[in-house]
Amino acid sequence: MAAVDVNQTITGHKSAIIRNYTTNPRLIYQTVSGVNGPLVILNDVKFPQFSEIVKITLPDGSQRSGQVLEIAKNKAVVQVFEGTSGIDAKNTICEFTGDILRTPVSEDMLGRIFNGSGKPIDKGPPVLAEDFLDINGQPINPWSRIYPEEMIQTGISAIDVMNSIARGQKIPIFSAAGLPHNEIAAQIVRQGGLVQLPDRPHEQTNFAIVFAAMGVNMETARFFKQDFEENGSMENVCLFLNLANDPTIERIITPRIALTAAEFLAYQCSKHVLVVLTDMSSYAEALREVSAAREEVPGRRGFPGYMYTDLATIYERAGRVEGRDGSITQIPILTMPNDDITHPIPDLTGYITEGQIYVDRQLHNRLIYPPINVLPSLSRLMKSAIGDKMTREDHSDVSNQLYACYAIGKDVQAMKAVVGEEALSSDDLLYLEFLVKFEKNFISQGHYENRTIFESLDIGWELLRIFPREMLKRIPAKSLDKYYPRGGAKE
């Protein structure tokens, strides 16, 4: 009997494959058997396909779209992107399209604003598509990837000198509620560009920004939109907005649609694209909601066990590819729940990405902007993007020495709280002086202050001159001879 069932199934699948759906249209179903959170369960479905898109028509005539998540015999579990409120089990009509989720892409998307599903919300016409691309992207052959080597100058000293970002890198901003991560991201977008070396002509690069917001409030969306408009870059920006009052489930596809648009602009239009994704914590919580609705075995803190893999499908879509002029640099922003860096979201993100920029609440409380704590921050690709002919030959040594002095200064500050200032040595007092001036003069800067890498390095040298030359053990004698004397050589 089982063999007959298998043969019937194979025959049925063959007939479904060779069927001409242009003249013999798809079946529509009114077999909704249950609704659970963002999921709809359908019975008696013939030949459903994994990840197939389903068009859902409600009794009032409004349409929604969903995606097949799971198939069991003749049952299909469909995830509805616009939410399941108002779905009537008897009168809701579902049509299986036989295709995966594709998004229309075009160079005309720049300067436009879309919702989380990729539909225009700026009162403009629909995008005249040059292509329809799978939102999950195409896998990139690791052999074809180009190692990121060109440094992006952000104009922020704490990033440029201590945690340099390379073009094609993925580096998140680890922040928390109430911290100015949006302002930092906006400043990076506003000021970002290649390092302009004295012997290199000024390069006008093909620059574009793709901004995707997931679960943000109206104030955050308005802040970014207004900032892009005020600095004149709106015609180079493509915005995807899923607001806090939009369907939670839509957040699953928003970053994928944004990255599909970014890949088209980078690899087909030869643009250097900066992708800003905020807030990845909202995305992970949407993932947890779907997982809970499917009654999957939960992992840490209720998040699904496959969250690492799922986040990787987003973050790994950054980089450069051989034979293509464009690049994708990713700056995801995530808010750490309860300022906890060991929470699964920042923890797994840190494994996948090439470093992180850590926004610190204590620095913010002391009115230091940008409140970037350089000690837990890291850029894993920094070493290949700095040095002679890329920034300046003393860059790496100055960065190492600043790190060492700041770390020792923090230790001395902790010791001072225990033993008092009178018990400190003269060297300890120098480190304390450096600590205060480093945070005040180096880390702290204005919202619209755009420092070149050379200005930032010179500020670093001014701070290092607090110490006698023999205490600067991480800088070679050649660099000390050139830059340590006051008014040292400037490029």
Swiss-Prot record:
GO cellular component: proton-transporting V-type ATPase, V1 domain
Family statement: Belongs to the ATPase alpha/beta chains family.
Gene Ontology biological process terms from the UniProt entry: ATP metabolic process; cell-cell adhesion; positive regulation of apoptotic process involved in development; positive regulation of neurotransmitter secretion; regulation of syncytium formation by plasma membrane fusion; response to hypoxia; vacuolar acidification
HAMAP family noted in UniProt: ATP_synth_B_arch
Pfam family, one: ATP-synt_VA_C
Residues that bind ATP: R380
Domain of life, per lineage: Eukaryota
Thylakoid found in the keyword field: no
Record protein name field: Probable V-type proton ATPase subunit B 1
Molecular function per GO: ATP binding; proton-transporting ATPase activity, rotational mechanism
Annotated InterPro entries: ATP-synt_VA_C, ATPase_a/bsu_AS, ATPase_F1/V1/A1_a/bsu_N, ATPase_F1/V1/A1_a/bsu_nucl-bd, ATPase_V1-cplx_bsu, P-loop_NTPase, V-ATPase_su_B/beta
Function comment: Non-catalytic subunit of the V1 complex of vacuolar(H+)-ATPase (V-ATPase), a multisubunit enzyme composed of a peripheral complex (V1) that hydrolyzes ATP and a membrane integral complex (V0) that translocates protons. V-ATPase is responsible for acidifying and maintaining the pH of intracellular compartments and in some cell types, is targeted to the plasma membrane, where it is responsible for acidifying the extracellular environment. Essential for the proper assembly and activity of V-ATPase. Required maternally for early embryogenesis and zygotically during morphogenesis.
Gene it is expressed from: vha-12
Keywords from the UniProt entry: ATP-binding, Hydrogen ion transport, Ion transport, Nucleotide-binding, Transport
Transmembrane segments: none
Quaternary data: V-ATPase is a heteromultimeric enzyme made up of two complexes: the ATP-hydrolytic V1 complex and the proton translocation V0 complex. The V1 complex consists of three catalytic AB heterodimers that form a heterohexamer, three peripheral stalks each consisting of EG heterodimers, one central rotor including subunits D and F, and the regulatory subunits C and H. The proton translocation complex V0 consists of the proton transport subunit a, a ring of proteolipid subunits c9c'', rotary subunit d, subunits e and f, and the accessory subunits vah-19/Ac45 and vah-20/PRR.
